[in-house]
Amino acid sequence: MWKKGKTFKVALLVILVGIVIVPIVLIQANKYIYKNRVSTYLIEKKGFVKEDIESIEGKLGSLPTFYVIVTFKNEPDVKYMYFAHDNNVFQFDYQITDEGQREGIKEEDLKNYNPRS
């Protein structure tokens, strides 16, 4: 009888750990996948080189669920948001940092802004 109780507790623990860990792993994996899709798109389709990119980070949002924030070295005060789903990768927004706004950066000054047409 005692063995069945112990087995049940171990099984319950495994299930609970799985419920917590699996979503975390899936989220991190998707962020990594999206980051790589955007990086590949920028380098292979848009002609950037790795050195042009200051940072690239996969994010979890609401809509779109996963997106990527890219900062280019020639515009460190602007964050560009990219969507990457299946084979579709496109820039859907940008954000000028507080520092960039203090410097007076406006949309017409953006060097890497490429809205989807």
Regions found by a protein language model. Give the residues of each.
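Short, Lys/Arg-rich N-terminal segment immediately upstream of the first membrane anchor
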Residues: 1-6
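Compositionally biased, intrinsically disordered low-complexity regions
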Residues: 7, 20, 60-63, 102, ...
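Hydrophobic membrane-insertion alpha-helices, especially the h-region
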Residues: 8-25
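Acidic/proline-rich low-complexity IDRs
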Residues: 11-15, 41, 109
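Short, non-transmembrane alpha-helical segments in secretory-pathway proteins
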Residues: 24-53
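N-terminal low-complexity, charged segments
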Residues: 46-52, 57, 66, 94-96, ...
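Exposed beta-strand-loop-beta-strand "reactive/processing" segments of non-cytosolic proteins
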Residues: 50-85
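Structured, soluble extracytoplasmic/luminal domains of envelope-associated proteins
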Residues: 78-117
